[in-house]
Amino acid sequence: MIERIIDTEVIKDLFFKYKEKYNPIINDYTFILSYKIDNKYVAFLIYQLLYEKAEVIDIFVLEEYRRKGIGKALLEEMMKDKTIESITLEVKESNKNAILLYNSLGFKEVAKRKGYYNGVDALLMLKEVK
């Protein structure tokens, strides 16, 4: 089941172990979609929305739930937001499975960021939604 988390206290509790990473980005422009199975959070997608432009900050699926369409379902749910006209994201150039997923959803590579992930290059990808 996909749900939008809007209570900032729930967000902070949910991501407590990632506090240092995510606290600086939790604001009025941050949205989180979560995926629950048997009342357990197994995946989330964090994005920021400024006017009609969305940026995926992170997408995470617990390892035992990967390659089951959950990440795709979260991205498709995000794309249903009628206010979003374009979506950008960064992905490690070596993360071939993620790149295949993003390509299957219509994302295109628009730039490369040298050394973005601790010396590993990232691809900047874009999808026009409208």
PLM feature spans:
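Acetyl-CoA-dependent GNAT
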Residues: 1-64, 75-77, 81
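Conserved glycine-rich acetyl-CoA-binding loop
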Residues: 59-76, 92-100, 104-105
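C-terminal "cap" of GNAT-fold acetyltransferases
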Residues: 92-96, 115-130
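Low-complexity, intrinsically disordered Gly/Pro/Thr-rich segments
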Residues: 106-112
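Conserved GNAT acetyl-CoA-binding A-motif
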Residues: 81-93
